[in-house]
C-alpha cells in the first residue's frame, strides 16, 4: 500500500463524496466552456442539468462497466454511505448512485 492509498483510505466515505462533488462540477464546467457555451446563463443552466443526483445516476450507469475493481470499491464506499436526507427531485437510489460517483471522483482526485 502506498502513501496515497493510505491517505485516501483515511478519508470518510462522505468526505470523499464532498471532494468529488467539487471535482465533478469543475469537470462539467470545463467541458461546457470547451464546447461552446458562452453566456453565464447557458453555462449555469447546463451545469445544473449535469450536476444533480438524477443526471449523475444516469451517468454512473454508463460508467460502471468501464471501472476496474479498485475504482468500483471507491464507488461502493460512497454508494453505501449513510446519508440522512435526500434532496427533493431525487430518489434514494439516485442519490446513493450520485454519492458513489462523487466518492469515486474524490478518490481519483
Predicted segment positions?
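Double-stranded RNA-binding/processing signature
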Residues: 1-109
Amino acid at each position: 500500500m502506498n502513501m496515497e492509498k493510505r491517505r485516501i483510505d483515511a478519508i470518510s466515505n462522505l468526505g470523499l463524496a464532498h471532494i468529488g462533488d467539487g471535482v465533478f462540477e469543475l469537470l462539467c464546467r470545463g467541458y461546457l466552456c470547451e464546447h461552446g457555451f458562452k453566456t453565464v446563463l447557458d453555462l449555469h443552466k447546463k451545469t445544473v442539468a449535469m450536476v444533480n443526483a438524477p443526471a449523475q445516476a444516469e451517468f454512473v450507469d454508463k460508467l460502471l462497466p468501464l471501472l476496474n475493481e479498485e475504482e468500483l470499491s471507491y464507488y461502493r464506499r460512497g454508494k453505501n454511505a449513510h446519508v440522512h436526507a435526500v434532496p427533493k427531485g431525487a430518489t434514494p437510489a439516485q442519490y446513493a448512485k450520485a454519492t458513489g460517483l462523487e466518492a469515486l471522483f474524490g478518490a481519483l482526485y
